[in-house]
Amino acid sequence: MQVNIAPSWKPYLEEEFNKPYFEQLAAFVKAEYKSNTIYPPAKQIFNAFELCSFDNTKVVILGQDPYHGFKQANGLSFSVGKEVRMPPSLVNIFKEIESDLGHPVPTNGDLTRWAQQGVLLLNATLTVREKQPGSHQNKGWETFTDTIISILSQHKQHLVFMLWGNYAQKKEVLIDTSKHLVLKSAHPSPYAADRGFFGNKHFSKANAYLVEHGLTPINW
């Protein structure tokens, strides 16, 4: 399994990579890529950590599983490649940004530009079998990504965590809310967006918090 991450993550994660659970996870993932169609492409599994360094992280947006459709997942939660049709949840995210900040909906759903500004687009599970949502859950990824959240909470100051939906909100227990901002709402999926995602103004709230603490806001 290729672990491509920005250098500033390495002091915090090298110990994690050597733990027995991660070695078992890596063996499982390697075998899965050999025998099945797995997303994202192997070289993009750690894309979130390659594009958004530990030092640069300002905002964390937590997803659950990578997209499981053809060529959708690119290693960033909610993001898709430029040539791929935007999934409904991502369309709703852009609709909320348009309502909140007045930014027009972009022509593609590649969120690389967010990651490069310090938005860690983190799925709880980093791989999935094609057309089998949840197929790589409970194999060790959640242990790893929970550790990421805990490390960020412990070692960083004034982060914004966006927790959308019940699954993501369960991760709040890992976050020190006395020194970070946690924003919670319904999930942006079409089944839930009308129950509190639309109108949550998370993007303007995040930027106001960053500016308040002397940090550059995100160009959403």
From Swiss-Prot:
Pfam families linked: UDG
Name the Enzyme Commission number(s) assigned to this protein. Answer: 3.2.2.27
Task: Give an example GO biological process.
Answer: base-excision repair, AP site formation via deaminated base removal
Q: What is its main location?
A: cytoplasm
Catalytic positions are: D65
InterPro entries noted in UniProt: UDG_fam1 (IPR002043), Ura-DNA_Glyclase_AS (IPR018085), Uracil-DNA_glycosylase-like (IPR005122), Uracil-DNA_glycosylase-like_sf (IPR036895)
Could you cite one Gene Ontology molecular function of this protein?
uracil DNA N-glycosylase activity
Gene3D superfamilies linked? Uracil-DNA glycosylase-like domain
Compartment annotation: Cytoplasm
Instruction: Report the record's disulfide bonds.
Output: none
Example of a GO cellular component annotation carried by this entry: cytoplasm
Catalysed reaction(s) here are: Hydrolyzes single-stranded DNA or mismatched double-stranded DNA and polynucleotides, releasing free uracil
Name the UniProt key words of this record, in alphabetical order: Cytoplasm, DNA damage, DNA repair, Hydrolase
> Is Transport among the key words of this record?
no
Known SUPFAM superfamilies for this protein? Uracil-DNA glycosylase-like
Summarize the protein's role. Excises uracil residues from the DNA which can arise as a result of misincorporation of dUMP residues by DNA polymerase or due to deamination of cytosine.
Tell me which family the UniProt entry assigns to this protein. Answer: Belongs to the uracil-DNA glycosylase (UDG) superfamily. UNG family.
Q: What is this protein called?
A: Uracil-DNA glycosylase
* Organism this protein belongs to: Amoebophilus asiaticus (strain 5a2)
